[in-house]
């Protein structure tokens, strides 16, 4: 698994699993809202009244509408509202 996805996948999976409403801001400033229906290495399926396939390279920020629990690959729960990567190996 790529280093960048060690945070990305658990974060997006928790959003999907808990059906947390999100605002996704694109690099061009457009704001999309909905729930993460599915995702892979390159895209996120965002569901609102319709499903939209959003390419990850076009995303600037993903903002959850409420706090939720994220389980990292170490199986330690993190609070998403204060989620930090202090255990990131690149800092060592």
Swiss-Prot record:
Species assigned in the record: Shewanella loihica (strain ATCC BAA-1088 / PV-4)
One biological process term in Gene Ontology: regulation of DNA-templated transcription
Biased composition (Polar residues): 69-81
Function: RNA chaperone that binds small regulatory RNA (sRNAs) and mRNAs to facilitate mRNA translational regulation in response to envelope stress, environmental stress and changes in metabolite concentrations. Also binds with high specificity to tRNAs.
Classification via InterPro entries: Hfq (IPR005001), LSM_dom_sf (IPR010920), Sm (IPR047575)
Top-level taxonomy: Bacteria, Pseudomonadati, Pseudomonadota, Gammaproteobacteria, Alteromonadales
Keyword annotations: RNA-binding, Stress response
Positions of the Sm domain: 9-68
Family matches, as Gene3D superfamilies: 2.30.30.100
Full protein name: RNA-binding protein Hfq
Family: Belongs to the Hfq family.
